[in-house]
């Protein structure tokens, strides 16, 4: 099993690489790429951790050496949010970065499962899809926008609010990965009831949690460590699916034939081909149905931005 992390010298990339070095199955290869010259050194640093995961780092303009033979590619390359920015402000820089990296993926490892972490995810996944289509290698079951951070935040905040063991909290988060497009389905959380006020405030906190971190770091960064953990959880689920483990389900932003938009975050069953099955997200409350319907213009606009960027 070979996993490549593109953007591995950044805050998310380094955290993700550390977690993968400690969690990937024995005999795996972990390949780190970043434009930054420090990247081979990050790999050397991580190589001193005693796990049976072989690690190599590559720097420079061309990610190709890192991508050869990759089964899973996780892309976190790009600039991070600063106070006053929202995820869409990142578009101007990150769109080109994702396009260039995916062009290399299309040539070097077109069958790899690709997880896009780089924001704005609503748009960068659409960019990736268009690039892969142009190259004639697009497989909708192998491309994912990583929205796991919205899920782990939801689990954490619910557990805190209700005094639960967070390991027992399961919640689907649907829609997209920015602001109003993030929709936690709180009505489905088992064994818990929320007042209308709790639903409204919890939904808002989950939607704005990224901004909470950006402001708390006071210009010193964005949510890198929690995102690293979320990306590792999702990446490990991809790996476990590829290895044939049963019942691996995660929410992800995918081209899953949704009635709502071309790309939509919902639960997917993972397996040897990436997505084995897009799962229904179930019954929703009136509040959730309204929130879902009112986000769709925003979501579709984000997607169109990505499609138009490549065309």
From Swiss-Prot:
Q: Which GO terms describe its molecular function?
A: L-malate dehydrogenase (NAD+) activity
Q: Where is the active site?
A: 177
**GO BP annotation list:** malate metabolic process; tricarboxylic acid cycle
Say if the entry is tagged with keyword NAD: yes
Gene Ontology CC terms:
cytoplasm
List residues binding substrate: 81, 87, 119, 153
The cross-references to InterPro entries, in alphabetical order and at most eight, read: L-lactate/malate_DH, Lactate/malate_DH_C, Lactate/malate_DH_N, Lactate_DH/Glyco_Ohase_4_C, Malate_DH_AS, Malate_DH_type1, Malate_DH_type1_bac, NAD(P)-bd_dom_sf
EC annotation from Swiss-Prot or TrEMBL: 1.1.1.37
Reaction(s) catalysed (UniProt annotation): (S)-malate + NAD(+) = oxaloacetate + NADH + H(+)
Q: Which family does it belong to?
A: Belongs to the LDH/MDH superfamily. MDH type 1 family.
According to the record's subunit comment, the protein's assembly and interactions are:
Homodimer.
Q: Which HAMAP family does this one have?
A: Malate_dehydrog_1 (MF_01516)
What is the role of the protein in this entry? Catalyzes the reversible oxidation of malate to oxaloacetate.
Q: What is this protein called?
A: Malate dehydrogenase
List the source organism.
Shewanella sp. (strain MR-4)
**Upper lineage:** Bacteria, Pseudomonadati, Pseudomonadota, Gammaproteobacteria, Alteromonadales
């Amino acid at each position: 099993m070979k996993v490549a992390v593109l953007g591995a010298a950044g805050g998310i990339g380094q955290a993700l690489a550390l977690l993968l070095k400690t969690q990937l199955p024995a005999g795996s290869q972990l390949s780190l790429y970043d434009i930054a010259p420090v990247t081979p050194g990050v790999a050397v640093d991580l190589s001193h951790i005693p796990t049976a995961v072989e690690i190599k780092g590559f720097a420079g303009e061309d990610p190709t050496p890192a991508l050869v033979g990759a089964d899973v590619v996780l892309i976190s390359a790009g600039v991070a949010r600063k106070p006053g920015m929202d995820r869409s402000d990142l578009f101007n820089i990150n769109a080109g970065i994702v396009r260039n990296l995916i062009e290399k993926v299309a040539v070097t490892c077109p069958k790899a499962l690709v997880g896009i972490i780089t924001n704005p995810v609503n748009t960068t996944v659409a960019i990736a899809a268009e690039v892969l289509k142009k190259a004639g290698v697009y497989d909708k079951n192998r491309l994912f926008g990583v929205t796991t951070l919205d899920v782990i935040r939801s689990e954490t905040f619910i557990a805190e609010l209700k005094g639960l063991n967070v390991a027992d909290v399961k919640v689907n988060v649907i829609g997209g990965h920015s602001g109003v497009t993030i929709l936690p389905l709180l009505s489905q959380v088992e064994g818990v009831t929320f007042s209308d006020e709790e639903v409204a405030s919890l939904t808002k906190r989950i939607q704005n949690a990224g901004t909470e971190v950006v402001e708390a770091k006071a210009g010193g960064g964005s949510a890198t460590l929690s995102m690293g953990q979320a990306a590792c959880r999702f990446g490990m689920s991809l790996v476990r699916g590829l290895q044939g483990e049963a019942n691996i389900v995660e929410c992800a932003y995918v081209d899953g034939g949704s009635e709502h938009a071309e790309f939509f975050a919902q639960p997917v069953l993972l397996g040897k081909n990436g997505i084995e099955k897009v799962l229904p997200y179930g019954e929703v409350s009136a509040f959730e149905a309204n929130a879902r319907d009112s986000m769709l213009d925003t979501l579709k606009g984000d997607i169109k931005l990505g499609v138009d960027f490549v065309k």
